[in-house]
Amino acid sequence: MGPLASWARLIVSISCLTILVGCRFSYSETRRWPSPDNQLDAVEVSAALGVLSVSSSLHRNIYIVKSGEPWLGGSHVASFQFPKGAQQVQLSAVWSSPSELTLRSSGAREAGLNSREISVGTRVVRLALEAVP
């Protein structure tokens, strides 16, 4: 192997390391849906993978928290996986009562509830998942 091949391998190795170091996950609160009695919030949190300042949305999570509290300490109730570059992706949460929450999604490749019921403080919230065309 000549000196040119060694330099080429070194450049490729440095490029790969730069890409790996430039990758990072970031999580951000996208929106909140307050319950009818304003005691709880359903919170959408988006996770993105940033690579050299280009990010693509990977998935969205739903948490239920006491009204106004940060999502990080909340109860994780659902995950949605969306195809890369999907344009018509919709996700919404509809409270039909202070103890019933329906999560609606369109364009999700995978969606799953962690549970059908969850306790938040002294309240039990029933959950439903609905696919929207």
Language-model-detected regions and their locations in the chain:
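Acidic, small-residue rich beta-repeat scaffolds with periodic aromatic anchors
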Residues: 22-24, 78-133
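N-terminal export/targeting and maturation segments
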Residues: 23-71
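Glycine-rich catalytic cores of cysteine/serine-nucleophile enzymes that process amide/ester linkages
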Residues: 66-82
